[in-house]
A protein has these predicted regions:
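Non-heme di-metal
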Residues: 1-319
């Protein structure tokens, strides 16, 4: 059997500077959930109503499912169509961080929740029709043979579908609840923002190589797919937030992020400003520069840097 030749990646010869830029961003952003003291949220968790606790577990289980899809199928499906070996490296990093994100929700569960309640939430995720449907819609394009449609699906997952879930911890954070959990979610959001931007950038680079007719067909496909996902997401939101007064606010957040997903692909917004008007408190909570509550020496937050050790001498202690 003849083996194909393998070329070693050379980071000193880069054909697309964006690959190195994003690699550096992702690696400098690296974090692990163990660095965030989620146990500090136990008192706040106990003040939530049963409905709020159950909703939080369902939201995080749904997000875990999407992260699992992106880790196991999504990012790996983009590898065969990478334009450069450096793009392959970035996609591998993206895949790994999606696994970290999925692991993070389990850290939240093990810290705040009862096992039986978490097990019930996982069982719910297997049976919830809108949740399974959005995963199936995305997955069918990942398993298809059109590399540009894969990228469209990936951007919609990274930049749109997560946000019906992300809304809830940002809402709690804006009211001073589960603030350490919100710190962790902000780290995830920061990663997803880079992922959606980068994959959208690669989509636009590939679009330069095809005909105008093909570009128009793909744009039509993208808007049709977004509307299909949006309709399903409305149903998911109505079911998820049924026992709260928050569904309309979540839907505005969906429109806001759907427009951002389209911008990542190089397209104009779909939803008018009045449909995408998000509560300023939620936008403030989303900021990656929001104040973290955990130890800044951990280096895992987004608004501080890793502490540096300096050797001391005996005279330093002569006060």
């Amino acid at each position: 059997m003849k083996l194909s030749r393998i070329s070693a990646i050379n980071w000193n010869k880069i054909s697309d500077d964006k690959d190195l830029e994003v690699w550096n961003r992702l690696t400098s952003n690296f974090w692990l959930p163990e660095k965030v003291p989620l146990s500090n949220d136990i008192p706040a968790w106990q003040t939530l109503s049963v409905v709020e606790q159950q909703l939080t577990m369902l939201v995080f289980t749904g997000l875990t499912l999407l992260d699992t899809l992106q880790n196991v199928i999504g990012a790996p499906s983009l590898l065969p169509d990478a334009l450069t070996p450096h793009e392959e490296a970035v996609l591998s990093n993206i895949s790994f961080m999606e696994a970290v994100h999925a692991r993070s929700y389990s850290s939240i569960f093990s810290t705040l929740c009862q096992t039986k309640d978490v097990d019930a939430a996982y069982a719910w995720s297997e049976e919830n029709a809108p949740l399974q449907r959005k995963a199936q819609i995305i997955q069918q394009h990942y398993r298809g043979d059109d590399p540009l449609k894969k990228k469209i699906a990936s951007v919609f997952l990274e930049s749109f579908l997560f946000y019906s879930g992300f809304w809830l911890p940002m809402y709690f954070s804006s009211r001073g609840k589960l603030t350490n959990t919100a710190d962790l979610i902000r780290l995830i959001i920061r990663d997803e923002a880079v992922h959606g931007y980068y994959i959208g950038y690669k989509y636009q680079k590939n679009m330069e190589k095809i005909s105008q007719a093909q570009r128009e067909e793909l744009k039509s496909f993208a808007f049709d797919l977004l509307l299909e996902l949006y309709d399903n997401e409305l149903q998911y939101t109505d079911e998820l937030y049924a026992e709260t007064p928050w569904a309309d606010d979540v839907k505005a957040f969906l429109c806001y992020n759907a427009n951002k997903a389209l911008m990542n692909l190089g397209y104009e917004p779909l939803f008018p400003a009045e449909m995408a008007e998000v509560n300023p408190a939620i936008l403030a909570a989303l900021s990656p520069n929001a104040d973290e509550n955990h130890d800044f020496f951990s280096g895992s937050g987004s608004s501080y840097v890793m502490g540096k050790a300096v050797e001391t001498e005996d005279e330093d202690w002569n006060f």
